[in-house]
Amino acid sequence: MNTSQLREKFKEVFGVEADHTFFSPGRINLIGEHTDYNGGNVLPVAITLGTYGAARKRDDKVLRFFSANFEEKGIIEVPLENLRFENEHNWTNYPKGVLHFLQEAGHTIDSGMDIYIYGNIPNGSGLSSSSSLELLIGVIVEKLYDLKLERLDLVKIGKQTENDFIGVNSGIMDQFAIGMGADQCAIYLDTNTLKYDLVPLDLKDNVVVIMNTNKRRELSDSKYNERRAECETAVSELQEKLDIQTLGELDLWTFDAYSYLIKDENRIKRARHAVLENQRTLQARKALEAGELEGFGRLMNASHVSLKYDYEVTGLELDTLAHTAWEQEGVLGARMTGAGFGGCAIALVNKDKVEDFKKAVGQRYEEVVGYAPSFYIAEVTGGSRVLD
């Protein structure tokens, strides 16, 4: 959607002109899964599937929201003084949360807004539609009210909204990738320190294909919080002998030497994934920087195997996509991405083989699962921003 279309749609809905238009990307994580809340490293990119917005300030204290993705909900009106979570306010709880925490941080938001939203991230796909919306609202408010905000502060407010307003116990990777994304770069982020480097993404004759299971995944209803709790318990057991706060602080040798302290086989498996995935992510960064895409692909494959057997977050749909992708000509690697239990997988595919790849994987998936997957080419873009 371009800016003139955004402005036209805004005027259709609200009857006035928008002040500005905005875009906030989605994200995929190339590798480093379920490590962000374990103090480990991640390697995400911001993508051109994302969330568009148009907005204007109002003279009163009323917030009016409209989403083209939920047209049946119509315009949802919220008093600026009432930024509490309410089920009937549906998707607008995300913007309400961002506004609430901006105000709590001392930023002055002294009038209402009209906000039009359109997103082309499939809902429940695991490509971070909620984080994209959170950062979009942050950028809108920053522009309309001329707030002087560090981008990292907006990232943290997005995470705070997810954790403390919506109630999903997620890490910071999604908001960080979306807020800090850069053209044609992956972000190598240490989630323990929030130190990061931009890693140029030269895929040569290859593209990243996103494979959507089309099995909707509700993060707050999934086993995500259970996995996080298992890892936190493993850390507390390891602390009997080790001075650590997160699994991300461990190398494989130390983990192997002290894993006997973890009293449950499942928790050992969860912790082993977190430690090994952290090492794989470091190796993947080095492979990208050296242009060793075959090695990068092998690390993707190993990541999926670990997520299947040690972390147990894949399932029939994601496994079918990844396993079938591995068998195709021109594929360097494939893995699930995101929290799992549905959502999406990604594959690194030679660009000349993409159509054959989609046909073969789609056919096999439909035979096994009973309905078709969807495919998108991941184009890497910059972070959340003002368009005009």
UniProtKB/Swiss-Prot annotation:
GO cellular component, one term: cytosol
Marked site: Transition state stabilizer: R27
Compartment annotation: Cytoplasm
Enzyme Commission identifier(s): 2.7.1.6
Reactions accelerated catalytically: alpha-D-galactose + ATP = alpha-D-galactose 1-phosphate + ADP + H(+)
Cross-referenced Gene3D superfamilies: 3.30.230.10, GHMP kinase, C-terminal domain (3.30.70.890)
Alphabetical UniProt keywords: ATP-binding, Carbohydrate metabolism, Cytoplasm, Galactose metabolism, Kinase, Magnesium, Metal-binding, Nucleotide-binding, Transferase
Disulfide bonds: none
Gene Ontology MF term list: ATP binding; galactokinase activity; magnesium ion binding
Pfam families: GalKase_gal_bdg, GHMP_kinases_C, GHMP_kinases_N
Binding-site residues for ATP, renumbered to this chain: S67, G124, S125, G126, L127, S128, S129, S130
Residues annotated as the enzyme's active site: D174
Family, per entry: Belongs to the GHMP kinase family. GalK subfamily.
NCBIfam families listed in its UniProt record: gal_kin, PRK05322.1
Name the UniProt record assigns to this protein: Galactokinase
Lineage, broadest ranks: Bacteria, Bacillati, Bacillota, Bacilli, Lactobacillales
Recorded name of the encoding gene: galK
